[in-house]
Amino acid sequence: MKKIALSLTILLGALSASNATAFDGDVNAGKEKSATCAACHGPDGNAPVNIYPKLAGQHADYIYKQLTELKSGMTSGGKEGRMDPVMSAMAMPLNDQDMKDLAAYFSSLNMSEGATPKDVVDVGAMLYKAGDAERGIPACAACHGPRGNGSSLAKFPKISFQHPEYIKSQLEKFRDGTRHNDLNGMMHDIAIKLTDKDIEVLSKYLGGLH
């Protein structure tokens, strides 16, 4: 818990020192470069297959960060960045401007809405908004916001309306350490305390959070 609090303190200090960062991606160029992406993420950025993430409406800075780290995962043999058998290979031929253009394009689109099953609303809302102090689990809303919109400056992703199946898989990867490109291991430190049921409830809850 102390590690998470320290990470947030460092992050907030860095953000206060700089009001914003210029993002020089080109939306039109990104649209032209996105044809290959559409196979998995959909022509409008809303992945038709739920194991792939929706990219529409995601923060450009976050998309750019993930693309650079996916490429780093491949070039380092998984020692750095984020390693994914499919996406790391797809990111390999992209140069820096390609990544910025793609990020700008997908962030300009609208993410499709999802729904939250009634049977997880109460438990999901409690865990997301308040966490679980007894187990040392902080509120998800502390970083991702009360509506799950995240933060562009902090590079915390928008997680509301995301496919539950994708959220579930990423929380499991953070928990078991197969994904480790989170700031100071914050997501691993949180996910390792989540049960399978917690992850299932949160994933479904986020599907319709707005």
Go through the PLM ranges and name each one.
Residues N28-A35, K129-A141, S160-S169, D196:
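Sequence context surrounding c-type heme c attachment/ligation sites in exported
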Residues M1-T21:
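Gram-negative bacterial Sec-dependent N-terminal signal peptides
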Residues E113-A154, S160:
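Surface-exposed interaction/gating patches
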Residues P48-A56, L70-T116, S152-K158, R175-V201, ...:
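Axial heme c-ligation environment in periplasmic c-type cytochrome domains
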Residues S18-S34, P48-I51, S108-A133:
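Electrostatic cytochrome c docking/interface patches
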Residues Y64, S108, V123-A130, A141, ...:
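Predominantly soluble domains enriched in secretory-pathway, periplasmic, or organellar proteins
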Residues C37-P43, L102, I137-P146, L202:
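The canonical Cys-X-X-Cys-His
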Residues F23-G73:
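The feature marks the first
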